[in-house]
Amino acid sequence: MATTATEAAPAQEQQANGNGEQKTRHSEVGHKSLLKSDDLYQYILDTSVYPREPESMKELREVTAKHPWNLMTTSADEGQFLNMLIKLIGAKKTMEIGVYTGYSLLATALALPEDGTILAMDINRENYELGLPCIEKAGVAHKIDFREGPALPVLDDLIAEEKNHGSFDFVFVDADKDNYLNYHERLLKLVKLGGLIGYDNTLWNGSVVLPDDAPMRKYIRFYRDFVLVLNKALAADDRVEICQLPVGDGVTLCRRVK
């Protein structure tokens, strides 16, 4: 999920019922879905996701589950989706903004060809190094160029060199929601025509459809407006074709067409 400590949450998100009371939607970090039925989501995981999950990704998921901010991780079904997507578009040069322990990063690295690359950025190297042994064990660490620190300066440096324009096949953004639009404007210069940008958490725990006065955790409420603005902006942006999917916490794919 995101890279900022303010976006970390306790065990699980909560929703308000008709009486305004709080109720827990899911009881474990393995459940990260907007589906109303826990049983249905567990069926998806048990039937189609976990049996096909590479051992290295399973190990990284289990390591991450012990971290106090484990809700920041990409869900297993979304990791499977990203892995398939990378293969479908034949991506070779990719970027990830917001790494956390690297579950989505590993999903991407495993999908890339041997000479594929990922420019990965996160403000917290410690979290990345927590998952690094799993990435190294999978034999894909050589594909990753990890940069610790804010992503915007790195993007600006890339844009300053003409050779980087339109050079990336795929970018996955799972970081500070208040900068998503800043990332978007820069990434449109760096992603090739026909290339994809994926924005994570675009349904933001389902809060995008809640009334303003609905009970919400503080960090959900704080970033909710940024997500709402992003969704509206992407829907109106004729430089991209978009597809918003209820995978994980919501992911919006943008295909650059201009």
Curated annotation (Swiss-Prot):
A divalent metal cation binds at D174, D200, N201. S-adenosyl-L-methionine binds at T74, E96, G98, V99, S104, D122, A151, D176. One of its GO terms (biological process) is methylation. It is an enzyme of class 2 (transferase). Disulfide bonds: none annotated. Residues 22-31 have a biased composition (Basic and acidic residues). InterPro entries: Cation-dep_OMT, SAM-dependent_MTases_sf, SAM_O-MeTrfase. Residues 1-31 are annotated as: Disordered. Pfam families: Methyltransf_3. Its cofactor is a divalent metal cation. Substrate binds at K32, D174, N205. GO terms for molecular function: caffeoyl-CoA O-methyltransferase activity; metal ion binding; S-adenosylmethionine-dependent methyltransferase activity. CDD domains: AdoMet_MTases. Its EC number is 2.1.1.104. It comes from the Eukaryota. PROSITE patterns: SAM_OMT_I (PS51682). Pathway: Aromatic compound metabolism; phenylpropanoid biosynthesis. The keyword Transferase applies. Belongs to the class I-like SAM-binding methyltransferase superfamily. Cation-dependent O-methyltransferase family. CCoAMT subfamily. This is Caffeoyl-CoA O-methyltransferase 1. The gene is CCOAOMT1.
